[in-house]
């Protein structure tokens, strides 16, 4: 049962009690109760004789008891209201308040059975895009589709609208305040790097002094660099990216291996740079795009578990072992009281059968099966069995409609079409709006 449901039930019980106890809700007031009758004013009772000398005394006693009864009723009323406030208001805060403190939601929050934030539709919204890629120094040239000559901007004007709840609109200054002193870490492949770039550009729109944002090592953004960290010095937080396309550790060539084996992937060993991740306040993982034959078997890379070379292991089976290794590391290393962990599901591409890339002008009316992914299902299964809470950013289905959002031929190399990566601004901005909702749906203390 959600907090909202429990709160509503409590309200009904409280109001039911008030209907009995409060003079406003009852035609028979406290003065007609047995206690009130016994100590009623002598004027209201016929004693069959003349008033006794103690009449004034009885009047005083009657008046005193009436006052006490009224006072008791009022106190009870206030206690009930106070209890209802303490119980209900925090729940309402979670249900109706977006991370910017505005009344944004008309239904349940993420995680409640009444609302799946990933079940919805794309709707046109002229408030988008959230930033200009040409004005953000952290967008790779290859992802700036408008800057690379894309002739229309309709693909920028779409917002994700869940069917039964609302994603809060991005309020940059509120988010900057909430991130003060934090460390946000993305770990994964180039899709993770794209989301990292998107978040930085979104956050920079709230700063007048853009020079206060810089890469901590003075590095330019490249595809192969293992670490990139951008510091927002005026708010004392960093947004970091660690390149770990498989999450597990690449292995060296074994001398006794068959000739076709050029390298291995150690499925039971997490990437050696994992010690850099564990102290983050927010950890966002992904892996999937490299788990294909072209990145593995066709390059001579095969799987290894312990000292055993698994030449016959399928890619899905290996992916599952790697996820279990990641999950064990999370459970043994990450402090859930400090670190919030999230895992983003597989991002669908929109290549045709002949590996041609036809980027559409508008979102596709149908997912054509791209809303399903064996990798995404494995992620959900593994996370479900973990002892530490992990949130899933289930972007697979919602992104499957966005055949209009890919880089296509509008990259830094127009000779190579790209229906895997996403334009910036674009779809990754929506992922980040949902990410921020997951992180900050609790009211600020």
Curated annotation (Swiss-Prot):
GO cellular component assignments: membrane
Pfam families, sorted: PC-Esterase, PMR5N
Chain location of the short sequence motif DCXHWCLPGXXDXWN motif per the record: 418-432
Placement of sequence motif GDS motif: 188-190
Transmembrane segments: 69-89
Keywords in alphabetical order: Membrane, Signal-anchor, Transmembrane, Transmembrane helix
Subcellular localization(s) per the UniProt record: Membrane
Membrane topology of this protein: Single-pass type II membrane protein
GO MF annotations in UniProt: O-acetyltransferase activity
UniProt KW Chaperone keyword: no
Function of the protein: May act as a bridging protein that binds pectin and other cell wall polysaccharides. Probably involved in maintaining esterification of pectins. May be involved in the specific O-acetylation of cell wall polymers.
Family membership noted in the UniProt record: Belongs to the PC-esterase family. TBL subfamily.
Note: Contains 2 motifs that are conserved in esterases, but it is unlikely that this protein belongs to the catalytically active pectin esterases.
Protein name: Protein trichome berefringence-like 7
Originating species: Arabidopsis thaliana
The organism's taxonomic lineage, starting at the top: Eukaryota, Viridiplantae, Streptophyta, Embryophyta, Tracheophyta
